[in-house]
């Protein structure tokens, strides 16, 4: 619950304090720290576990979170957009906004693809290739590394290239990555494919949230919440669907399902720009 609120509110805050030219870049920079945490924290915890007990590490984690809270208490945040309270009528009306729903369903598939990659890639590589489990996990790490590096690069690219062009190119890059996985790859090809997938998925959240923040500036926090809830539903449903289909047919369908999902995202994005 806390993580979901933090995710939504930090994105909304960055969108609110950024002008139109900077919004995509700043949201991308914010998203890069997700990847840095995903890569760095497990390594840090593994290192600390050699010297400290689980209880000490957990207490230390709590202290770090408390320091973060105390730091935020001293920050001067922007004034509320709705000083008289939450506009229930306007907020509920967002659920009828076709533009918001189209953009949210792009995140539905984006979040679903990320979740499926994290949960099914190692099984796919284990059953369709001769790659050992430890190297399959390393290939999966390549996806997070690709996503993190790409988001850092996007901070610069968004200032020079239209975000619509960046998103289309990124999704096609992810399609190429999944295509590499369909050829029963060795480790090198699998790792390259996963880097391309991570890099290809990097721009979706920054671009879509930037557009939502611009179109629904007066209710950006609520609009972001709608989009992120739909995204989380997508992660759950696509994971379940992958499990059902892989049991009925074979895990070999996994990359093809992801390619179809990416093509749907491209179609939804094209429609959302009209």
Regions from the language model: what does each represent?
Residues 29-76:
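Helix-loop-helix hairpin linking two adjacent transmembrane segments in secondary transporters
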Residues 98-141:
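Extracytoplasmic gate region of multi-pass secondary transporters
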Residues 22-41, 230-238:
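Glycine-rich segments within core transmembrane alpha-helices of 12-TM secondary carriers
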Residues 1-32:
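Cytoplasmic helix-loop-helix junction between adjacent transmembrane helices
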Residues 164-208:
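C-terminal transmembrane helical hairpin of 12-TM major facilitator-type secondary transporters
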Residues 218-251:
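A late C-terminal transmembrane helix in Major Facilitator Superfamily
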Residues 79-103:
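Juxtamembrane intracellular "pre-TM" segments in multi-pass secondary transporters
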Residues 150-162, 246:
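Helix-to-loop junctions at the C-terminal end of transmembrane segments
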């Amino acid at each position: 619950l806390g993580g979901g609120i933090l995710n939504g509110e930090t994105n909304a805050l960055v969108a609110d304090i950024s002008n139109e030219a900077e919004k995509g870049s700043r949201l991308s920079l914010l998203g890069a720290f997700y990847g840095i945490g995903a890569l760095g924290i497990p390594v840090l915890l593994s290192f600390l576990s050699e010297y400290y007990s689980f209880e000490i590490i957990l207490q230390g984690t709590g202290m770090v979170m408390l320091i973060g809270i105390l730091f935020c208490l001293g920050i001067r945040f922007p004034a509320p957009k709705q000083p008289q309270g939450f506009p229930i009528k306007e907020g509920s009306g967002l659920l009828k906004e076709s533009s918001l729903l189209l953009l949210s369903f792009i995140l539905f598939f984006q979040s679903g693809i990320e979740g499926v990659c994290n949960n099914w890639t190692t099984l796919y590589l284990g059953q369709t290739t001769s790659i050992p489990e430890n190297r399959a996990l390393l290939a999966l790490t390549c996806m997070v590394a690709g996503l993190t590096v790409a988001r850092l690069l996007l901070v610069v690219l968004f200032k020079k290239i239209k975000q619509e062009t960046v998103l289309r190119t990124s999704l096609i890059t992810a399609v190429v990555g999944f295509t590499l996985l369909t050829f029963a790859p060795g480790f090198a090809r699998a790792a390259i494919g996963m880097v391309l997938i991570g890099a290809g998925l990097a721009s979706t959240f920054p671009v879509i949230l930037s557009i939502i923040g611009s179109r629904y500036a007066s209710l950006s926090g609520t609009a972001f919440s709608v989009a992120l809830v739909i995204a989380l539903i997508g992660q759950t449903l696509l994971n379940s669907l992958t499990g059902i289909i892989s049991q009925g047919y074979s895990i070999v369908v996994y990359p093809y399902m992801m390619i179809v999902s990416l093509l749907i995202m491209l179609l939804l994005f094209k429609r959302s720009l009209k």
